[in-house]
């Protein structure tokens, strides 16, 4: 069983913000396969699906970003999911908008949702898909920037990166070794 977690903030207010690009990827996978998040438990909305012979859970924590681990850890425990079978998808200020980067494991890099995930799982050893959102180019505080919406001129780059991230996740679910997926999709 695989667990795909998109990090973001719940509610309409945050729906199209940079910080919610992890949710965008889950939404892309749901739309591609006509799946729905039809379960609400573990402080998250999730769906249990089958893809290419593999059971897959897609999760959008509803805890707000900084508490994401509170949703992920109990769901993993309940379904007995090994950390090797988890991918966490989230925004990255240090990558330009439109770029994606996959990692086998690592630190939180200042990302509070990832920090919470590490704290609750007790390990840094989970796979990640990071989607670039760039940094503010003016004096905009980082918190205002990540909670802001993408400008229209970035729509194509964002859409492309979300689709590539979904493609990478699907390749991994189908059984391609994660290191090969990294080689194929890292930009």
Curated annotation (Swiss-Prot):
GO-annotated cellular components: cytoplasm
Keywords, in A-Z order: Cytoplasm, Hydrolase, RNA-binding, tRNA-binding
Keyword Isomerase included in the entry's annotation: no
Site, as annotated: Discriminates between blocked and unblocked aminoacyl-tRNA: 9
EC number: 3.1.1.29
InterPro entries assigned: Pept_tRNA_hydro (IPR001328), Pept_tRNA_hydro_CS (IPR018171), Pept_tRNA_hydro_sf (IPR036416)
Biological processes, Gene Ontology terms: protein quality control for misfolded or incompletely synthesized proteins; rescue of stalled ribosome
Subunit and partners: Monomer.
Residues marked Stabilizes the basic form of H active site to accept a proton (site): 91
Root EC class: hydrolase
Xref: PROSITE patterns: PEPT_TRNA_HYDROL_1 (PS01195), PEPT_TRNA_HYDROL_2 (PS01196)
Domain of life: Bacteria
Family under the similarity heading: Belongs to the PTH family.
Family annotation (CDD domains): PTH
Cell compartments where the protein resides: Cytoplasm
Active site (record annotation): 19
Lineage, uppermost ranks: Bacteria, Bacillati, Bacillota, Bacilli, Bacillales
Protein name in UniProt: Peptidyl-tRNA hydrolase
Pfam families: Pept_tRNA_hydro
Role according to the record: Hydrolyzes ribosome-free peptidyl-tRNAs (with 1 or more amino acids incorporated), which drop off the ribosome during protein synthesis, or as a result of ribosome stalling. Catalyzes the release of premature peptidyl moieties from peptidyl-tRNA molecules trapped in stalled 50S ribosomal subunits, and thus maintains levels of free tRNAs and 50S ribosomes.
Catalytic activity: an N-acyl-L-alpha-aminoacyl-tRNA + H2O = an N-acyl-L-amino acid + a tRNA + H(+)
């Amino acid at each position: 069983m695989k667990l795909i977690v998109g990090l973001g903030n719940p509610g309409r207010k945050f729906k199209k913000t940079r910080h919610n690009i992890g949710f965008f990827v889950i939404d892309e996978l749901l739309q591609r396969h006509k799946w729905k998040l039809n379960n609400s438990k573990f402080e998250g909305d999730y769906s249990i699906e089958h893809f290419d012979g593999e059971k897959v859970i897609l999760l959008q924590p509803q805890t707000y970003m900084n508490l994401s681990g509170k949703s992920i850890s109990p769901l993993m425990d309940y379904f007995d999911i090994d950390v090797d079978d988890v991918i966490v998808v989230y925004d990255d200020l240090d990558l330009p908008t439109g770029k994606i980067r996959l990692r086998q494991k690592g630190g939180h890099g200042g990302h509070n949702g990832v920090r919470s995930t590490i704290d609750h799982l007790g390990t840094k050893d989970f796979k990640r898909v990071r989607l670039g959102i760039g940094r503010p180019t003016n004096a905009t505080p980082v918190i205002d920037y990540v909670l802001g919406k993408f400008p229209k001129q970035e729509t194509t780059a964002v859409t492309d990166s979300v689709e590539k991230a979904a493609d990478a996740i699907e390749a991994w679910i189908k059984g391609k070794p994660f290191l090969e997926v990294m080689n194929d999709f890292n930009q």
